[in-house]
Swiss-Prot record:
Signal peptide: none annotated. Catalyzes the interconversion of 2-phosphoglycerate and 3-phosphoglycerate. CDD domains: HP_PGM_like. Gene3D superfamilies: Phosphoglycerate mutase-like. The active site is at 10 (tele-phosphohistidine intermediate), 88 (proton donor/acceptor). Belongs to the phosphoglycerate mutase family. BPG-dependent PGAM subfamily. Pathway: Carbohydrate degradation; glycolysis; pyruvate from D-glyceraldehyde 3-phosphate: step 3/5. Substrate binds at residues 9-16, 22-23, 61, 88-91, 99, 115-116, 159-160. NCBIfam families: pgm_1 (TIGR01258), PRK01295.1 (NF002339). It comes from Rhizobium johnstonii (strain DSM 114642 / LMG 32736 / 3841) (Rhizobium leguminosarum bv. viciae). This is 2,3-bisphosphoglycerate-dependent phosphoglycerate mutase. It catalyses: (2R)-2-phosphoglycerate = (2R)-3-phosphoglycerate.
Amino acid sequence: MSGTLVLVRHGQSDWNLKNLFTGWKDPDLTELGIQEANTGGAALAEYGIKFDVAYTSVLVRAQHTLKLILDKVGQPDLLTIRDQALNERDYGDLSGLNKDDARAKWGEEQVHIWRRSYDVPPPGGESLRDTGARVWPYYLTEILPRVLRGEKVLVAAHGNSLRSLVMVLDKLSREGVLALNLATGVPMVYKLKADSTVASKEVLGDMSGAH
């Protein structure tokens, strides 16, 4: 009997609000982000799931989101594993820049390519493919074996690190994943088959509210 995998993107951060490229920089949640995480946690509590383990990145916005969710589901002391492999995509030289300022410096078309292409990284940073190249092996070696043993696993991470996972789980093409936006604080509940493919997927909230 295989288990359950729940993916949640962190709530809105200070830098999301300021329209800055964040990447591996480490801002905390806004008041709205706290509310989003609490809403996601309440949805999971209503769903009735109890987790065996949680995973998150080493960045505070994901860890704070996880803490709020675990409080809501009544598991504040759940075993939690933090790993850099789940960090957001590294935006390199764009990190900390306002997105409008970046467009003014490099041009709208170039910035769009860096943000939305699959395999073109910004200067000093990672492409979505690069991000997946560290996220997917970590999933295969650390997270998936637990799910296949029947455990219920929660992952609180970031837009691009989670898109890398969803791309494979949902069998999306490159074009499909580039069009994919994950709303902040909205849990995605995957039931996996014994062969690690997806038996079912349920979204506990509105995915149209992506930042």
